[in-house]
Amino acid sequence: MFGRHSIIPNNQIGTASASAGEDHVSASATSGHIPYDDMEEIPHPDSIYGAASDLIPDGSQLVAHRSDGSELLVSRPPEGANQLTISFRGQVYVFDAVGADKVDAVLSLLGGSTELAPGPQVMELAQQQNHMPVVEYQSRCSLPQRAQSLDRFRKKRNARCFEKKVRYGVRQEVALRMARNKGQFTSSKMTDGAYNSGTDQDSAQDDAHPEISCTHCGISSKCTPMMRRGPSGPRTLCNACGLFWANRGTLRDLSKKTEENQLALMKPDDGGSVADAANNLNTEAASVEEHTSMVSLANGDNSNLLGDH
């Protein structure tokens, strides 16, 4: 019933000319709509309880149904008239030849009650959100209940998962307290390999430790990148000997290093001779052997003598 009759806007309901008066009467009889001759008869939404009652036939009763964004009046005259009058937001529509069975079918479809009270029958039609688009009005935002609901929602949204959030100020404070090495975060416990040369921090660390020599090859701690752990404890081997010990579990053979040095010294330069190279080789070998013997005697370990190897 309601699907076949569309809502007529206010600008289409007006006064007809005298020459077309009969055409309007015949058209209204065919379509079921009864036009009104004066726009002032159409009630305004603000005065829907006053002016709309003048347009309803005598003997009918009005019940206004107010929902969110809807103002609807449904009226049926006494028995035998079979005329349905609907007033919605200032527009009045009258439908003829509307039986009670059609009204019951529409109400059952919209979820209304199908039981009609005796006497003047007045029905309320509620706007269903599932069947009709809901129109949002600005007046809803001004309601105090709406404002309180929005306030509760904002508070709940701000408090959601608050324990999992870490503020940036706290993270920055923790980052400032952490130890850094060349801009990178490092552990608070300094490792054995944290002493490098070439920076002020490394120089200060080198000054804190006295100069020592490798217990295996006798090189000074200032001539190696870092001192490493050996069989005698930490900082007892140079970088080369410590890496060899950590990878293979044995100390490296210094005789191979001596042979390499000999071959390098035996190669004559442009302005030298083979005899000069041999003399230099003997001098270097004697100095290395003497230095190694002194280091071994100082550490009390006679097994590290060059002759034993």
Swiss-Prot record:
BP GO terms, sorted: regulation of DNA-templated transcription
GATA-type ZnF: 208-267
Region (Disordered): 1-35, 187-207, 290-309
InterPro entries: CCT_domain, TIFY-like, Tify_dom, Znf_GATA, Znf_NHR/GATA
Domain CCT residues, every copy: 146-188
Any single Pfam family the record assigns to this protein: CCT
Record's GO cellular component terms: nucleus
UniProt cross-references to CDD domains, sorted A to Z: ZnF_GATA
Listed Polar residues bias regions: 8-18, 187-202, 293-309
Main location: nucleus
Subcellular location: Nucleus
GO MF annotations, alphabetized: identical protein binding; sequence-specific DNA binding; zinc ion binding
Protein name: GATA transcription factor 25
Source species taxonomy: Eukaryota, Viridiplantae, Streptophyta, Embryophyta, Tracheophyta
